[in-house]
Each structure stands twice: as structure tokens, then as C-alpha cells.
């Protein structure tokens, strides 16, 4: 029973001395007494290599490299193990989660948090922490008895003690945790003869838990000798750099005193690890109070980059230089990091430079497609077949792998499901998934081609196969009563899915193609899944449980699964975190992410027990728990010290000025401290360095081409670029080995986001030999030619979702007003309040179920919206009644369609126009309402267009002149052409072109006292005043509002009279009959010009800017055209907005005779 302590700063030969001792013993007596080297889990492989790679060792049976848990197993093999089953991490958390749910109603502080998955994880960690520090439920109950304890802390401890006690009772005599196994190991030590003759070495630790100290105590007491290696100078000052390992030394001294033995200390002061004076000086002076500055010889570098990505790119380039120019091997290099954001960058950047590497971290399995499928399957059942988990399940491609182009089929199914609002048991309704229904996707019904029909039949078959599998799973699970039944049902369902065979086939293919790591992942996925099922049966067995609870507990277990990354080669760069990675004696170590906030890192308490409570327990009960945040904060300098002293040749520190989320970052204060130790240690700003040394960017062929592209792009933008890049371009271009992909990159240099003119032949292929279109299509072209090309040429459509859009509201209002108008023959003035409500209810009952597959009855929100729609309609009808009371014009026709060849007698004929290429233009559409008034054998017509959007309920004559607003003039033209079909007189003249804004008006009052019901009603009615353009003919004026008289402005039409009876300029929007005809004729010419441009093949990204507004703000195709307001302003078209459109139209000559039948 002897105790040795090797003490010294980093790199002073402590571990080397230990390894030398062990090797000498192995050489002298290969079969002698056992030698046990205890190290952290992440260090065991490295230490085993140290023995295996020694050519002087021909093998030995006496030395083992173990961590504490493996050592306990070694003892158990000798003296016998515990009879209880050991709980895995996943099994422990599943059990605790179930206990929490059962005991939720008894909890005082955590009752509301108990339902969340994360709470059971926190509670499991806290119980494990208590076990590590030998705190039992009885200890907690004794703490609770303290009357001076705060109520919140008391309630917290009562809750934790309740779960902890219940957990201990559940596992008593049946199960054992990892911490309990270590306690059993301590009890078994006296029985081990193997241990009594063993020499124990403990290396690589900087701190221990209470239970680990008890193990060390037992080893010292029962082993032949124990040697512990600590990185410390022996200073017990709590503010010392070596506070943490010195704290370990203090505990070891206490153990030695308890056992009444002395510690044979051996101090190591001579530095051996470092090959140069730079690293020696860095290690010796890092914690010095009085700085001794020396000249830096170039073995320490500090790099400053603009972004984290550029930082890792530079590290990759420097590793290539290390390998190529400095003859290092990849295994001589290590990268240490602390910010988790860097892990993704390593995976995405290092493979681009063909650098082999191994990251010493465990990745969660939850994002693997198989696990995502299983968890989504669970959520489908839990959520009663909601759409999001169903789509996630489908997109994993695990259950649909047998289908060709399964991802495309799932995309089509997703479009259909989102449009029709499929959720819940509607997934099971085969009628909803009839192939014919797919012809109506995107609101545009069309006849299916044979290929489309075959594709949609595949979609339906795929959906049916997946649904059958889910139904089988649901049925199997619903028949289970105990946890064992559920686990069996789940496994049998996976076999029904043929998942085992599918995974094994995929694994073999990956192995065959050289993707060994991916193949290994599949093995681990399946083994992990089976392990969770085994754990469930082990922990709960025949215990009754609801399916809902089983799925919750099972999901908790799946969350605990992690991939164990097995190194694929020995020669690779080691990557790990600064806190945990064990890399020693590397020729070059890169410490990345050296920013303030990362190194040092603000330490915040994350456990259920706060720092204050930990201190309270230590003071009141002498119970030591895991270190508090302030203690951990003091150890940040030691973390930095250990990380930077792992190298023996070179250390490179790096940091970026911008974080992963775009936030500004500052340099670590430790780097300032390091820089102060040297006279010539400058921070290398990478952008400036690369500008001066462009060759430093040319380390890897593929990546050099990408950097070359960036340099040439800058050169084309008239920026100054080093001649080296132009030389590099010529070398790469002329080299058959290097120039692959160069042409593709260079083509991007001249890319300017310009579209190509289609030409007449291709335009005919796209648009047909005649244009059959609505007015809105031509208006869309005027907004932007590319928008028209994308929508009508490429036929790109936004995914239609099961939700109400603005245009849906417009359609509803149109349909409801048509229904009511036809019921009363357009006589709105006969309506009273009772009739309005009756008709509104009838119309809504008839129309709303047809909207978006009965969307407005799908939820409480939409049912509320339906009532709002009814209220708007009632207000609108009141306004129409008011307007009809004072107008001689009578509504006669509603929702009147027009086209070149009418299908019914009620439809109107639209005159065919012709493009300059001779292509027929067939305009079609629908006029909301036509009002007529006849006097002296002359009929006057009003065009009334309902608009639910205020912005579109205005007739802008400037827009009309430039062809941006073509609707109203087209409608009036159609009506004038169809006097006989409309039953009008031989003479027909325009009355008004008017918009009616269907909306819910808002009236503002300063206070409640100002509200007058009568005035409120009048103000509301005035909000519905028609806007647009009116024929200045006196007959029309008099008929529009019979109340018109001098000094009166109508509140129903845009007309007002001056004192002398003339039309007022401010209150009237009028034009004479000839002007209206000229606008109509000019509108036709705009049609012809627009259609001719379409057939010419114009597809320019050229939005029309009007009144400082762009159509891009509401365009669905921005992701296609990539127009950018910052750099593409030259693309914008403009018009002369200063013109007076009335005066401008006077120059238009009328060629056609208006009022004639076509």
C-alpha cells in the first residue's frame, strides 16, 4: 500500500516517466503482477497505441488500459458481479419519465413542467449527479427538515426527493445504475486478489467526483501501489492557474491521512515536450504575475478572419502546407474547438480539401431517416394523423424506398394534401384520393395525359401502401396491454415494414461502395432500436401501460441514442473540444474560435440545483456537489492552458470577427495575454495577408479554382487583383489535370441574370397559335414580361394551401352578391333588414361549403371568419340598397361571362383582335354587374366591378393609358358590342365605369360620447361610395343620383355640382363620351401591342415601377427571377407619370364605330 504522486506543469515528462516505468516492468517480466493504467474514456485508445506502437515491446499480458467502469467489470469477473440488471442511460431516463408522469399530481414546484420531455432529462441528470456525489434520498429529506430553508428550495427538494425515492424503490433488488455499480465495485475491492498485487497508475484526470474519490481510496488501500499523475505545481492557492488539479491533490492528501500513509511526491520541473523556446516560454509565463517578454521565433501564430467559415478554410490550407511542405502526418495534427458551431464547419469544409479527420463527439441518432421515420410514426398516432408528422414520415423515404422517384411522388402527394386540407382520418378516405381529383390541383382543372395519369396512380398507390403500414402498426399497438406486448407489436410491425431486410441491404450496398462509416451507422441504428425495446421490456416487463404513455416513453428512449464514431484510419487529424479532447504531443495544434465569450466561456448553472443551493448544502450539511459556476469560471484559464500545451512543435490560435448568426465577436482576452508575452507576435489579419500573399490561397486544386473565380470576378469589377491570379488562371486553363470544371466556373463570371428572347416559333410552341386569355394576363405582362413568361409560359404555380387567401374572399363576395342579386332581380332598394339577413344566410349556406373544399367549416377560426363575411355582406347590401334608392340605373346582369364563342345565350361575344404577327387574340372574362338606364330610345350602361381590396378599387386613367389597367375599358367595350344580347335599344352609350369596394368600414371617433348611431350609419354608407369614371352627359349625371342639385356632392357616385349647376372639378370624376370611346379604342391597341410582344418572345426581367412602387412586392416569382432592388434598378421600366391622361387621349383617332353589334 504505497502512494506516489507525479506533480508538474504541462510537458514536464510526468506521463513519459509513467509510460517508461510501465514498459520497463513489461520488458523485465511480461507475465508479472498486473499493471493497470486508469485514464478517461477518451484517452484509453491513445494510450493503448503508445504500447502497441513500441517496437521494443513484444507483447505483454500484465498491462491493461482501463477507465473506472471497465476496471469495475474486471474486478467483477474475478469476485463475482451484482445480480441486478444494469440500467442503460436510456432505460434510466425512460423509467424516470414514467415515474414523473405517475407522480405529477404530487409535485409542488414542478407540476406544470412535468409534462415536458426535457424535464425528465434534467431530473435524470440531477439524480445521477446526486449519486456521483453520494447524496441519497435520505440526505435530501434531512435537508428539507431545515426550517430556515426557503420555501421554493424546500418544494424543489421535496419534488426531487419524491422522484428519487420512487426511483430507488423501483430499482431495488432488481436493477442497478452505473453509479450504483461503482459503489458495488468499492465494496468488492477487499475480495480481489488480483487487485492486491496490482500496480495502479492514474493519468489524464483534472478532477473527480465523490464516488471516484472513494474508488481511489479503495485502490490506495488494497492495491500494491498507486501512482497518480497531476498537472499542477502543487500550489493550493484557490486563485492559482492549477486550482482544479491542486484541489484533487488536496483530496488525495486527505485520503492519505485517513489511511495513515504518506505520499511520495516527485516534482517534474524540466520541460521536455516542447521543441522550441516559443512554446516553452508560453507554458512557463502564461500565469506569470511579472511578464518576461521575449522575441517570438514563429512557432506561435494568431489568425484573425472575417467569418468562421473563412477561419476553417484557412486552417485547412495550413494543414495541407503542414503535410506537403513540413512532412507531417495527419495524425501529428490536432484541432481543438469549443463553440459547437464549428463542428458543422469541419464536416462541410475539411472533406473539400481531402483531409481525413475524426471528431471526438457523439452525434444524436434522432436525425437519421430511420429514426425520423419511427418518431414521426409515433407522432402520427399521438396526433391523430395530423398532416405535419405524416409528411415527415413520407419524406424520410424509408417506407417508400421501393418506388422509383419516390421523392417526386411524395412531393406531388404533399401538394395535393396541403391543397385539400387532408388531416386526421381523411387520410383513410380513398374517395378523396381519386386520381381524377389530381387533375384539379392548383385550382386549374385540366384533362390528364396518360403520363400524368400513370404518375398520379403511382402517387395513390404509394399513399395506400404507407397508410396500410400505419394502420397495421396502429392495430398491432392498440391490441397490446403491457409494455412487453407493445414492444413485441412494435418489432413485429418493423418486420411487417420489412425494415430489417431493407436496412441490411442498404448497409451491404454502402459497404460495397466504400461508405463504411455510413454502413456502420445503419448497424448502430438497428442495434440501438433493439436495445431500446430490450430496455423497455427489461424495465417495465408485463406492467400495464396505455399506448399513449408507451409511445411517449419509447420516444424518450430514442432521443438518448447516439452514434459512436469509429476512426476509419489511423492517419487522420484529431478534432475535439478543448474541455474533453485528450491529445498530447502533437506537432501542430490549432485552437479555433478563440473569441471572448467562448474562451473564457461564461458559465451558467444548468442543473435543477442552483449554485446558491449547492453552497447552502456545503455550508449546512458538509455535502459537496458538482462545482458551482463561479468555480468553473475560475478554471477557464486552466482549460486554455491545457489546450495550448498539447503541442510540441507549433500552436496556431484563430478567431473570427463574426459569429454563426452574424453577430460581432471580440478576440479572447487570453490571446491578448499570450500576445503580451512576446515582442514580435502579431495578429495576422487573413484578408490583408491573402491580399499580399495570394499564393497562400493556392494550396488545393479544387478550392484554388473557387478562389480564382472570386478573384477574377473582382478583376472584372475593376478592382485591383494580384497578377498571380491571372498567372494561375493561365496555368490551370492549360493543364488537362487541373482545368476540369474551369469552364463552368468561368461562365458564371459573365452571368448577368438576363433572360433570352424566345422568338416567334418557340413562343407559338409555348403559348399556342392563338391567345386565349383574360384581361389580368395582359395586365400581368405589363407589370413584368418575365412574370407573364413564368406563369403562362413555364406555367409555374405556387403551391396551393388549405387556407383562405385574399382572392378567395373576393370570389366569395362575388358569388354571394350574384346569388342575392339574382334572387331580387337586382332591385336592392326593396330590401329591408330582415330580408338582408335572410338572403345573406341563404347565400352563405349555399356558397361557403364549396369554397376550398369546405375550408370555412374546418375550424373554429374559419367559422368565426364565416360570420365576419356575413356581417360584411349585410353591410354591403345596406349600402347597395341606399345607392339603389337614389339611382335610376337598375342592375340587370350579374357575373356575365364573355368569350369569342359563347357557350350559352347569357354569355356575351368578345371581338377577336389580331397581333402584328397575325395571331388571333381571344379575350375572355366576367363582368360583375351591368346596370342600365333607358331614356328616349337610348340605353346607358354602367359597369360595376366588385373589389374586396381597397388598393384595386380605384380607376387610374394614367394606368389605363399605359395599358396597366385594362379591365374596365374592356368590359365597357364588350357591353357596347352586345346590345342585342343584353336586350338594349339600338343606341347604347357608356354611363359609368365604377368600382364598388366590398369591405368592413371603420369609423374613428375621439370619444364614446361622440358616437351618434344615425350619423354612424350615414358615415358607414358613405364608405361604399363608387369610384371610377362617369360619362359627363347630363342625362347620365341626373340618372346616377336623383338628388343632385347645385352645391351638392353625391355620396354614392363620384359626381358633384357647383353653385351654378356645373360639374365640380374636386368632387367629380367625369369625361365626355368621345373621350371614353378613345380610351376604349386605345385599350384595344394596348391589347394588340401587348399580345404582339408576347408572341415576339419577350421575357425580360423588367418590372414596371409606378408611383415608387414595384409589382415585385407581391410577385410569386422573385425566387425565380432573382431581381434585386439594390443592384437591378436599371432593369426597372418607368412611364411618364406627369401626363394628363385626358389630354393625352385626345390624340387618339377612332377607327371603329362604337355601339354596333359584333
Swiss-Prot record:
Domain named UvrD-like helicase C-terminal: residues: 269-583
Cofactor mode of binding and number, as noted: Binds 1 [4Fe-4S] cluster.
Broadest EC class assigned to this enzyme: hydrolase
Top-rank taxon: Bacteria
Record-linked SUPFAM superfamilies: P-loop containing nucleoside triphosphate hydrolases
Known cofactor(s): Mg(2+); [4Fe-4S] cluster
EC number: 3.1.-.-
GO MF term list: 4 iron, 4 sulfur cluster binding; 5'-3' exonuclease activity; ATP binding; double-stranded DNA binding; helicase activity; metal ion binding
UniProt keyword terms in alphabetical order: 4Fe-4S, ATP-binding, DNA damage, DNA repair, DNA-binding, Exonuclease, Helicase, Hydrolase, Iron, Iron-sulfur, Metal-binding, Nuclease, Nucleotide-binding
InterPro entries, per database record: ADDB_N, DNA_helicase_suAddB, DNA_helicase_UvrD-like_C, P-loop_NTPase, PDDEXK-like_dom_sf, PDDEXK_AddAB-type
Binding site for [4Fe-4S] cluster: 784, 1112, 1115, 1121
Domain UvrD-like helicase ATP-binding: 1-275
Residues bound to ATP: 8-15
GO biological process, one term: double-strand break repair via homologous recombination
Pfam families for the chain: ADDB_N, PDDEXK_1, UvrD_C
NCBIfam families cross-referenced by the UniProt entry: addB_Gpos (TIGR02773)
PANTHER family, A to Z: RECBCD ENZYME SUBUNIT RECC
Family: Belongs to the helicase family. AddB/RexB type 1 subfamily.
Function description: The heterodimer acts as both an ATP-dependent DNA helicase and an ATP-dependent, dual-direction single-stranded exonuclease. Recognizes the chi site generating a DNA molecule suitable for the initiation of homologous recombination. The AddB subunit has 5' -> 3' nuclease activity but not helicase activity.
Subunit structure, as described in the record: Heterodimer of AddA and AddB.
More details: Despite having conserved helicase domains, this subunit does not have helicase activity.
Record's protein name: ATP-dependent helicase/deoxyribonuclease subunit B
Amino acid at each position: 500500500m504505497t502512494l506516489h504522486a507525479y506533480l508538474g506543469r504541462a510537458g514536464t515528462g510526468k506521463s513519459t516517466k509513467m509510460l517508461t516505468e510501465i514498459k520497463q516492468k513489461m520488458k523485465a517480466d511480461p507475465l508479472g503482477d498486473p499493471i493497470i493504467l486508469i485514464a478517461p474514456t477518451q484517452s484509453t485508445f491513445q494510450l493503448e497505441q503508445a504500447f502497441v506502437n513500441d517496437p521494443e515491446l513484444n507483447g505483454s499480458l500484465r498491462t491493461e488500459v482501463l477507465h473506472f467502469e471497465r476496471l469495475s467489470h474486471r474486478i467483477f469477473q474475478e469476485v463475482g458481479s451484482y445480480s441486478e440488471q444494469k440500467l442503460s442511460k436510456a432505460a434510466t431516463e425512460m423509467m424516470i419519465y414514467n415515474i414523473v408522469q405517475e407522480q405529477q399530481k404530487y409535485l409542488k414546484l414542478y407540476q406544470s413542467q412535468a409534462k415536458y420531455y426535457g424535464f425528465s432529462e434534467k431530473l435524470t441528470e440531477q439524480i445521477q449527479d446526486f449519486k456521483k456525489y453520494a447524496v441519497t434520498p435520505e440526505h435530501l429529506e434531512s435537508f428539507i427538515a431545515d426550517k430556515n430553508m426557503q420555501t421554493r428550495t424546500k418544494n424543489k427538494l421535496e419534488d426531487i426527493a419524491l422522484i428519487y425515492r420512487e426511483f430507488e424503490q423501483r430499482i431495488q433488488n432488481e436493477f442497478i445504475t452505473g453509479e450504483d455499480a461503482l459503489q458495488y465495485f468499492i465494496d468488492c475491492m477487499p475480495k480481489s486478489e488480483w487487485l492486491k498485487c496490482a500496480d495502479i497508475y492514474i493519468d489524464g484526470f483534472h478532477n473527480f467526483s465523490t464516488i471516484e474519490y472513494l474508488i481511489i481510496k479503495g485502490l490506495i488501500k488494497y492495491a500494491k501501489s498507486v501512482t497518480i499523475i497531476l498537472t499542477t505545481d502543487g500550489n493550493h492557492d484557490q486563485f492559482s492557474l492549477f486550482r482544479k488539479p491542486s484541489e484533487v491533490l488536496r483530496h488525495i492528501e486527505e485520503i492519505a491521512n485517513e489511511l495513515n500513509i504518506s505520499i511520495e511526491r516527485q516534482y517534474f520541473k524540466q520541460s521536455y515536450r516542447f521543441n522550441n523556446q516559443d512554446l516553452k516560454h508560453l507554458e512557463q509565463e502564461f500565469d506569470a504575475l511579472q511578464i518576461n517578454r521575449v522575441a517570438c521565433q514563429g512557432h506561435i501564430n494568431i489568425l484573425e478572419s472575417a467569418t468562421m467559415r473563412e477561419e476553417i478554410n484557412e486552417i485547412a490550407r495550413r494543414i495541407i502546407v503542414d503535410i506537403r511542405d513540413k512532412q507531417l502526418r495527419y495524425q501529428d495534427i490536432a484541432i481543438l474547438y469549443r463553440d459547437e458551431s464549428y463542428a458543422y464547419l469541419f464536416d462541410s469544409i475539411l472533406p473539400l480539401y481531402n483531409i481525413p479527420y475524426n471528431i471526438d463527439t457523439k452525434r444524436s441518432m434522432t436525425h437519421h431517416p430511420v429514426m425520423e421515420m419511427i418518431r414521426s410514426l409515433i407522432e402520427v398516432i399521438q396526433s391523430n394523423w395530423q398532416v405535419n408528422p405524416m409528411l415527415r414520415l413520407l419524406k424520410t423515404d424509408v417506407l417508400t424506398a421501393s418506388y422509383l422517384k419516390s421523392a417526386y411522388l411524395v412531393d406531388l402527394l404533399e401538394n395535393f394534401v396541403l391543397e385539400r386540407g387532408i388531416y386526421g382520418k381523411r387520410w383513410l378516405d380513398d374517395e378523396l384520393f381519386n386520381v381524377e381529383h389530381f387533375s384539379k390541383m392548383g385550382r386549374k382543372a385540366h384533362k390528364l395525359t396518360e403520363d400524368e395519369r400513370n404518375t398520379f396512380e403511382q402517387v395513390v398507390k404509394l399513399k395506400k401502401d404507407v397508410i396500410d403500414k400505419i394502420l397495421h402498426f396502429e392495430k398491432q399497438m392498440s391490441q397490446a396491454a403491457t409494455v412487453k406486448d407493445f414492444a413485441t407489436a412494435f418489432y413485429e410491425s418493423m418486420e411487417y415494414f420489412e425494415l430489417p431486410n431493407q436496412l441490411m441491404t442498404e448497409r451491404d450496398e454502402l459497404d460495397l461502395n466504400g461508405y463504411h462509416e455510413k454502413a456502420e451507422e445503419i448497424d448502430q441504428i438497428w442495434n440501438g432500436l433493439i436495445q431500446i425495446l430490450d430496455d423497455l421490456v427489461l424495465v417495465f416487463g408485463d406492467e400495464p401501460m396505455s399506448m399513449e404513455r408507451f409511445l411517449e416513453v419509447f420516444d424518450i428512449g430514442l432521443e438518448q441514442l447516439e452514434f459512436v464514431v469509429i476512426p476509419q484510419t489511423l492517419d487522420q487529424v484529431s478534432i475535439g473540444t478543448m474541455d474533453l479532447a485528450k491529445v498530447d504531443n502533437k506537432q501542430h495544434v490549432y485552437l479555433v474560435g478563440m473569441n471572448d465569450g467562448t474562451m473564457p466561456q461564461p458559465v451558467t448553472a444548468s442543473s435543477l440545483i442552483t449554485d446558491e443551493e449547492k453552497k447552502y448544502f456545503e455550508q449546512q450539511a458538509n455535502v459537496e456537489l458538482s462545482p458551482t459556476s463561479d468555480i468553473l469560471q475560475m478554471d477557464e484559464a486552466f482549460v486554455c492552458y491545457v489546450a495550448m500545451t498539447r503541442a510540441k512543435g507549433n500552436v496556431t490560435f484563430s478567431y473570427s470577427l463574426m459569429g454563426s448568426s452574424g453577430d460581432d465577436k471580440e478576440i479572447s482576452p487570453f490571446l491578448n495575454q499570450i500576445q503580451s508575452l512576446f515582442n514580435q507576435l502579431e495578429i495576422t489579419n487573413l484578408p490583408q495577408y491573402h491580399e499580399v500573399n495570394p499564393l497562400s490561397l493556392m494550396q488545393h486544386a479544387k478550392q484554388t479554382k473557387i478562389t480564382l473565380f472570386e478573384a477574377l470576378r473582382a478583376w472584372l469589377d475593376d478592382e485591383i487583383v494580384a497578377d498571380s491570379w491571372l498567372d494561375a488562371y493561365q496555368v490551370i486553363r492549360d493543364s488537362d489535370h487541373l482545368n476540369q470544371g474551369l469552364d463552368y466556373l468561368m461562365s458564371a463570371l459573365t452571368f448577368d441574370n438576363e433572360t433570352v428572347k424566345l422568338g416567334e416559333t418557340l413562343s407559338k410552341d409555348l403559348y399556342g397559335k392563338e391567345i386565349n386569355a383574360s384581361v389580368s394576363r395582359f395586365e400581368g405582362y405589363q407589370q413584368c414580361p418575365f412574370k407573364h413568361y413564368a406563369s403562362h409560359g413555364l406555367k409555374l404555380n405556387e403551391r396551393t394551401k388549405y387556407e383562405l387567401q385574399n382572392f378567395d374572399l373576393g370570389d366569395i363576395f362575388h358569388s354571394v352578391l350574384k346569388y342575392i342579386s339574382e334572387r331580387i332581380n337586382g332591385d336592392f332598394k326593396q330590401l329591408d333588414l330582415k330580408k338582408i339577413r335572410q338572403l345573406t344566410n341563404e347565400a352563405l349556406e349555399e356558397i361557403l361549403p364549396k369554397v376550398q373544399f369546405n375550408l370555412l367549416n374546418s375550424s373554429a377560426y374559419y367559422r368565426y371568419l364565416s360570420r365576419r363575411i356575413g356581417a360584411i355582406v349585410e353591410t354591403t347590401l345596406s349600402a347597395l340598397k341606399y345607392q339603389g334608392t337614389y339611382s335610376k340605373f337598375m342592375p340587370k346582369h350579374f357575373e356575365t361571362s364573355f368569350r369569342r364563342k359563347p357557350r350559352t345565350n347569357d354569355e356575351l361575344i368578345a371581338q377577336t383582335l389580331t397581333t402584328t404577327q397575325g395571331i388571333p387574340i381571344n379575350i375572355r372574362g366576367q363582368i360583375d354587374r351591368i346596370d342600365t338606364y333607358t331614356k328616349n330610345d337610348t340605353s346607358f350602361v354602367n359597369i360595376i366591378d366588385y373589389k374586396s381590396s381597397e388598393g384595386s378599387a380605384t380607376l387610374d386613367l394614367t394606368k389605363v393609358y399605359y395599358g396597366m389597367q385594362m379591365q374596365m375599358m374592356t368590359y365597357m367595350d364588350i357591353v357596347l358590342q352586345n346590345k342585342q344580347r343584353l336586350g338594349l335599344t339600338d343606341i347604347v352609350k357608356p354611363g359609368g365605369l365604377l368600382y364598388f369596394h366590398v369591405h368592413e368600414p371603420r369609423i374613428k371617433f375621439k370619444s364614446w360620447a361622440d358616437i351618434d348611431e344615425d350619423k354612424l350609419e350615414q358615415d358607414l354608407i358613405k364608405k361604399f361610395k363608387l369610384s371610377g369614371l362617369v360619362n359627363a352627359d347630363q342625362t347620365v349625371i341626373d340618372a346616377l343620383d336623383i338628388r343632385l342639385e347645385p352645391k351638392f356632392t353625391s355620396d354614392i357616385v363620384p359626381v358633384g355640382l357647383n353653385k351654378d349647376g356645373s360639374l365640380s372639378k374636386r368632387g367629380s370624376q367625369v369625361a365626355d363620351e368621345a373621350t371614353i370611346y378613345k380610351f376604349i379604342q386605345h385599350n384595344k391597341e394596348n391589347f394588340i401591342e401587348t399580345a404582339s410582344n408576347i408572341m415576339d418572345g419577350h421575357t425580360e426581367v423588367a418590372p414596371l415601377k409606378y408611383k415608387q412602387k414595384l409589382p415585385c412586392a407581391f410577385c410569386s416569382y422573385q425566387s425565380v427571377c432573382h431581381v434585386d432592388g439594390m443592384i437591378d434598378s436599371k432593369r426597372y421600366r418607368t412611364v411618364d407619370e406627369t401626363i394628363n391622361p385626358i389630354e393625352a387621349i385626345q390624340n387618339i383617332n377612332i377607327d371603329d364605330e362604337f355601339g354596333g353589334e359584333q
